[in-house]
Amino acid sequence: MAFNLRNRNFLKLLDFSTKEIQFLIDLSADLKKAKYAGTEQKKLLGKNIALIFEKASTRTRCAFEVAAFDQGAQVTYIGPSGSQIGDKESMKDTARVLGRMYDGIQYRGFGQAIVEELGAFAGVPVWNGLTDEFHPTQILADFLTMLEHSQGKALADIQFAYLGDARNNVGNSLMVGAAKMGMDISLVGPQAYWPDEELVTACQAIAKQTGGKITLTENVAEGVQGCDFLYTDVWVSMGESPEAWDERVALMKPYQVNTNVLKQTGNPNVKFMHCLPAFHNDETTIGKQVADKFGMKGLEVTEEVFESEHSIVFDEAENRMHTIKAVMVATLGS
């Protein structure tokens, strides 16, 4: 079934129905097949797209740029030091300027209110590449990846757990997405790091309508039992103080995804997911600092799990591009 999402913003999954989200995932799968088959049709020819990045990025920037180029669009990258936003010019004014020059705008930055204001005043489709509260394009990629590794299951038949800092943008967005799609999600971590109570209540109400299930628990064994997928993210997010590491590592260490946690699912075919980047060894600057300070060569996930046959993180990363392409084509394409 086709949906007309033309000229819609893509700011958070709460704005979209179950059928609209499924449509975007299905479109992503179709576009992925077309790219692999060499039969892709350019739906964004002649379009100009602005990519605003107030936070650094690898996957999101590359995904937007490659997706746009594949579809025939031109992009302008505006980096953290490449604009006057918030310094000499408000987002409201920036939106009204860029909206007259560009056909679509991506924003990756800080508060959700910023991208909401951009979306309200730009007059063209605005896409959320990540804010402190939500990361909706990531969840489209996650759900496409789950479907690819579920042997024909529908999303509503999938059970998964997110371990660690569940109050961050990925934890929030996975909970919203699971509620919308009628999935069974467990958020497993210290209670102090559970999502905001108001958002949990809203998601519980959605899940009641879709047949989904949301569980919040501090008990790892309880949270992962029977899961098809285990998901985690870094314990300290972009923009947080380095001083947060001491307290965070102590709290989060019991929620590291390791081989014992995989076994606790009782599912020998369980898959591991991570939005990346991941601290799974000491081969990065931060990874080495953490190893030296805490005696841990992996934080949220061990090297053994990350490099195992259970890990599908690079399928997941690739799908960022296909799902972002679907969002742009659906909201902007001819």
Curated annotation (Swiss-Prot):
EC code: 2.1.3.3
Main location group: cytoplasm
GO cellular component: cytoplasm
EC main group: transferase
A family per Pfam: OTCace_N
Location of this chain's protein in the cell: Cytoplasm
Protein name: Ornithine carbamoyltransferase
PROSITE patterns: CARBAMOYLTRANSFERASE
Pathway: Amino-acid biosynthesis; L-arginine biosynthesis; L-arginine from L-ornithine and carbamoyl phosphate: step 1/3
Amino acids binding L-ornithine: 169, 233, 237-238
GO molecular function: amino acid binding; ornithine carbamoyltransferase activity
Similarity-based family: Belongs to the aspartate/ornithine carbamoyltransferase superfamily. OTCase family.
Catalytic reaction list: carbamoyl phosphate + L-ornithine = L-citrulline + phosphate + H(+)
Originating organism: Vibrio vulnificus (strain YJ016)
Gene expressing this chain: argF
Keywords from the UniProt entry: Amino-acid biosynthesis, Arginine biosynthesis, Cytoplasm, Transferase
Function text: Reversibly catalyzes the transfer of the carbamoyl group from carbamoyl phosphate (CP) to the N(epsilon) atom of ornithine (ORN) to produce L-citrulline.
Residues given in the record as carbamoyl phosphate binding sites: 57-60, 84, 108, 135-138, 275-276, 320
PANTHER family hit by this protein: ORNITHINE CARBAMOYLTRANSFERASE, ORNITHINE CARBAMOYLTRANSFERASE, MITOCHONDRIAL
Domain of life: Bacteria
GO BP term, pick one: arginine biosynthetic process via ornithine
